[in-house]
Amino acid sequence: MLNHVIVPASDGSLHSGQSTYGDMCMHLGIISSISVQQSFPPEYSLLPGTAIGYPFLCDSVSSTFYTLGAGLRFSALLPAMYAYLLVVAGAYLLFEVWLGRGGAATLALYLFFVGGGFGFAYFFDLSEAGGGGISQILSGFYTTPTNYTDKGIYWVNPIADMLVPQRATLFGWALLFPCLHLLYRAAILDERRLFLPLGVLAGSLPLVHTHSFLALGVISLVLLIANCLSLRGGLRLFLCYGLIAAALAAPQLLCFTFKQAASGSFLRLHWNWVNDKDSWLWFYVKNMGLIFLLMPPALACARRESRLFFAGGALLWLICELVVFQPNLYDNNKLIFVSYALMCGLTAEFMAKVWTALREGALRRAAPVLAAFTLTACFLSGGLTLAREYVSGDHLGLGGWVESGYQVVSAQQRRLAEYVSENTEPDAVFATATNHNNAIAMLTGRSIVCGAGTFLYYHGLDYQPREAALKLVYEQPAEWLDFYAQEYGIDYLLVSSHERGSWAVDEEYFAAELDCVYSDGDLALYSLK
């Protein structure tokens, strides 16, 4: 994480790692704009005038530090590092209360965070087609054993592809795992007094991570039904938990989430998640590997409590195989991976039982060898993915510091951002290209007319009219600049390599008709005032 968030390079540019090259830009824009523009509810700086329905609390916590004077990098990293520790600690405590102290809980933790499928086989293929080996993994862009879409590998590593780049998932899991811990103790171990604090924690989830709130709700519903069927008692406190959570969550859902999710692209039917190349069974065998193959015997040998707890995860998985909850089909993994965490717990419990039986049986001498092969198959894909993610950013190598990260902001654009921060109004609106790594939107907290469609589309936002307007502004300014400047409140217009790469920019018109307030090489910033 430390080498993935706008790392200053020796040439003055800012670098990122592979997984943060995309999403980080949007999150930094939200962090900086909440602090600089100080409006509530906050608006998208990538689409001015549109309230943010996305769970923004994961970013507003960093905005607090930025407002207090910390740098943008420090403000983004400090809460994220703390949240990451909470995720790991919360997951371990969940597995510990479920599986008991010892090897099973630790194994479950590693299976979840480092485990992977058989994707490594594509890189060590001995056939004529061959494989690129470790060099391809460590140097390719998203060609890892857990994220190789050309081969149908989508079972990403939770650390590299979810916790590091996806701040909402990171902060959501920081609350979700403690909630699951409390739920297990309250609903299965009958520590019913814990339903009340669980309701408060659960009710705080929607504006942190809506997917985590939904996942917790499904698992809780299954346990509630089981409680009713078994007539175990405690139904009143279980219902109190639900009422508290619903009362706290309702304003968040009604005022933010549901408004943005009203688009038809959010909720729709779809079978088999992202699989478009393989049969259902083979897709999960190669993506999840031994963890998937061991599930049937693990379920058969599991304790009643383990089967009951996993039942909610199984229902959640089934729902995710049938329903898509957001425009991006891939993002269903934010729900599926909650089921996967419970699957890892169930599998670890079974593997611990098998290990004990082998050590005490006739195969005790072969047990270490069998364990080594099993653990290698479980952890090789995830381990190689984490190695790739580390070297994809600027990092400490054997020969010293290596600047191998992806340039997300050039030195020229960084200087522009410094000028804008110091010399323009906080509520100024800029006409720029719609590149995702827009320095003004990322680093200054100012708004741009229209941001990257790769962000806005997956948030269910209608950005196409603004995108079309920008083309007219840059290519036919004599006819359209004044009209759209008034329509969208444009204060400044930028001409740089990004704009030239997007449109046939009429630079002669801008140079003759507008006041250039800042220039740096081939970059020029014009004022429309």
Model-derived regions: residue spans:
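Hydrophobic/aromatic-rich transmembrane helices and adjacent perimembrane loops
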Residues: 81-84, 169, 214-216, 328-357
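Hydrophobic alpha-helical membrane-interfacial segments at the cytosolic entry of transmembrane helices
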Residues: 108-111, 200, 232-254, 290-298, ...
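Active-site lumenal/periplasmic loops and adjacent helix-entry segments of GT-C-fold
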Residues: 1-175, 210-214, 403-407, 434
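Extracytoplasmic
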Residues: 359-529
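Membrane-interface alpha helices of multi-pass inner-membrane proteins
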Residues: 160-163, 182, 194-209
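Transmembrane alpha-helix segments characteristic
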Residues: 193-202, 219, 239-243, 303-324, ...
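Hydrophobic, aromatic-rich transmembrane alpha-helices
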Residues: 178-186, 219-227, 287-307, 350-353, ...
